Amino acid sequence: MTHILVVDNHGQFTHLEHRLLRDMDGVTVDLTDNTTPPADIDADGLVLSGGPTMADIGHCREYLTLDVPILGVCLGHQLIADELGGRIEAGDYGGYADVTVSISDADDPLVGSLAPDTRVWASHADEVVAVPDGFTITAESDICGVEAMGDTDRDLYGVQWHPEVAHTEEGEAVFENFVAICE
C-alpha cells in the first residue's frame, strides 16, 4: 500500500483531495494539519493542499526538505515555487474559472497523460510567474503561464488548478499519476 499524507493548509477543497485518494485502490491516506512537526511525517508522498494565504502554511516550507515526492495544489504549488527560488505574483484574472490547460510536456509523469490539453477548475488570485531552478513548466493556459511545473529529479510537482473538484475533467488522473510517482 502506498501511504499519502494530505497536508491541510485550510483550503476549502482539502477534504476532496483526501476523499479522492482514499477511494483509490492500493492507497492509504491520512489528513494532517500543516502544524505537524516534520519529524512526525511518515508517508510515501505528500499533497500540500490549497489554502487562503501564505501566512498560514505552518511547517510546509520544512516539508520540502523531506525525501518524499510532493504535489502542491494551488497554494501548495505557489509555496513550492516561492520557497525554492521561483516567483509568485497576483494573477491578472483572479477568482475561480473553467480553464483549458495545454500540456507542454507530454512525458511529464504527473500531467503528461493529460496531453494535449484538459479542462480544469482553477483559481488565479495568485500564481507562479517564474519557476525555480530545476523545474520545468509542464502546463500553461491563456490566463496563466505556469499552470503546472515539475522537478523530476527531486519528485516535486505543482498544479495551479484543483484536480480534486468535479469541474476538473481529468483530476483523478493527476492523483493516480502522483501515486505512481510515490510507489
From Swiss-Prot:
The lineage of its organism: Archaea, Methanobacteriati, Methanobacteriota, Stenosarchaea group, Halobacteria. Catalyzes the synthesis of GMP from XMP. GO terms for molecular function: ATP binding; GMP synthase (glutamine-hydrolyzing) activity. Residues 3-183 form the Glutamine amidotransferase type-1 domain. This is GMP synthase [glutamine-hydrolyzing] subunit A. It holds the Pfam family GATase. Pathway: Purine metabolism; GMP biosynthesis; GMP from XMP (L-Gln route): step 1/1. It is an enzyme of class 6 (ligase). HAMAP family: GMP_synthase_A. Keywords: ATP-binding, Glutamine amidotransferase, GMP biosynthesis, Ligase, Nucleotide-binding, Purine biosynthesis. The gene is guaAA. It catalyses: XMP + L-glutamine + ATP + H2O = GMP + L-glutamate + AMP + diphosphate + 2 H(+). Transmembrane segments: none annotated. The active site is at residues 74, 162, 164. Heterodimer composed of a glutamine amidotransferase subunit (A) and a GMP-binding subunit (B). Its EC number is 6.3.5.2.
